[in-house]
């Protein structure tokens, strides 16, 4: 249980989970009001 690979795996899992959570927060939370939509800016 104390091998470096175990702790490295846990670290990567936590890093991936936190980046995913932050991306969902920015994409759908309150900061999403500041995001621009390039499709709305484009005029045909």
Curated annotation (Swiss-Prot):
<keyword id="KW-0150">Chloroplast</keyword>
<dbReference type="Pfam" id="PF02468">
    <property type="entry name" value="PsbN"/>
</dbReference>
<keyword id="KW-0812">Transmembrane</keyword>
<keyword id="KW-0793">Thylakoid</keyword>
<protein>
    <recommendedName>
        <fullName>Protein PsbN</fullName>
    </recommendedName>
</protein>
<comment type="similarity">
    <text>Belongs to the PsbN family.</text>
</comment>
<dbReference type="InterPro" id="IPR003398">
    <property type="entry name" value="PSII_PsbN"/>
</dbReference>
<dbReference type="GO" id="GO:0015979">
    <property type="term" value="P:photosynthesis"/>
</dbReference>
<keyword id="KW-0934">Plastid</keyword>
<keyword id="KW-1133">Transmembrane helix</keyword>
<dbReference type="GO" id="GO:0009535">
    <property type="term" value="C:chloroplast thylakoid membrane"/>
</dbReference>
<keyword id="KW-0472">Membrane</keyword>
<feature type="transmembrane region" description="Helical">
    <location>
        <begin position="6"/>
        <end position="26"/>
    </location>
</feature>
<comment type="function">
    <text>May play a role in photosystem I and II biogenesis.</text>
</comment>
């Amino acid at each position: 249980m104390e091998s470096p690979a175990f702790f490295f795996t846990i670290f990567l899992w936590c890093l991936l989970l936190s980046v995913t959570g932050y991306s969902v927060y920015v994409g759908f939370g309150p900061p999403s009001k500041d995001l621009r939509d390039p499709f709305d800016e484009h005029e045909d």
